[in-house]
């Protein structure tokens, strides 16, 4: 290779390196997601998505297009949020989120409240809790948090008495008094509506009650906004810590927490699911 050829080769090689470094720098500075892409909002399958879709319909009129993505597994919405596959989710309460952050190391924070989703004790056989006979079966969720909620509500109904100080963390072992010797059966929460054919009464959360056609107004007893369990039936929006102040996220939540969406929620769910604002 002549001196001239070597010089031309070196010049071309250096030019290539320059272009490569420029291209890499441009790529590194590219935005993660263009603002013209829809805001992806995760939710558990069921009625909560109906409210989000109404908010999305209204937010599009204000320039914020949102895509509502439903998950059937409750572990997925936070995992997808942490991974950046969605921008926001709305399916959980603060205690559930706090536990997920603690156990899984998620960098996710709670934002504004969205819905109140009180549970009730339902029966297909009795119209009053007092009519439930001795030895009958009553059903509660088999997960610790909601199991405690259920036991508190059965205590409110006058059917059992819990040990002092157990509250939301109570288990079946914390039942201090059971004068009717009721059999307390622990069942997967999603199966509780179906259990009503086989038990005297069951604790059913609002999403499963709605899907099963149960009306909270017909419950033997229901949670109210002054209950100790309120944090457990108040849903919140959640976002990644580094995007909690994202203008599009804040705008969507503002639209969600508006009077038109409140009116929609009250009209559609007739008290079974309530706006939290």
Give the location of each predicted region.
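Immediate post-signal peptide segment of exported/extracytoplasmic ligand-binding proteins
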Residues: 26-40, 59-60, 129-135
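Extracytoplasmic "Venus flytrap"
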Residues: 36-55, 72-76
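Short helix-initiation/N-cap motifs at beta->coil->alpha
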Residues: 68-79, 166-194
